[in-house]
Amino acid sequence: DVRDIEKKLRGETFIESFSVKKIYPNTLKIIIVEKTPIAILQNKKKKYFISNKGDLINYKDVEAYKDLPIVFGGGEDFYSLYKELKNIKFPLEMIKSFYFFESGRWDLIMYDEKVIKLPIDDYIFSLKNFLLSKDNSNFKNYKIFDYRIKDQLILN
């Protein structure tokens, strides 16, 4: 029954949209558009994917998505950070994980083990500053870029 199929498809969080058409006498044409995961949210003991539109998708072990960055906490705040990162053309493929703190700020852990400690406010300025300095030879040996104190960069 077409309604049963539609009900099952609606319950699947990976599906963005779908259409089901009955072609008589005995054929169904089903078109499914999947959501696109951008990160894995680790929320306490549960895992979800976060889609490119900010939706939560029930986690499944999918080979194609195993290397997505992991978000620890702050799932509802992550999407706005993600959009800002895209807007400033931050190289998202460099980010291994995101850590959200209850104070309302983020740490970004990069694949090269560099850590960017962002302030609560005006973190776009800090991210742009990191983009300008990350390839500078004077900054190569530093692993921690701490922007938490306004108008200061603490390197470690």
Q: Could you tell me what each predicted segment is?
A:
Residues 2-156:
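Charged, solvent-exposed interaction patches on well-folded alpha/beta domains
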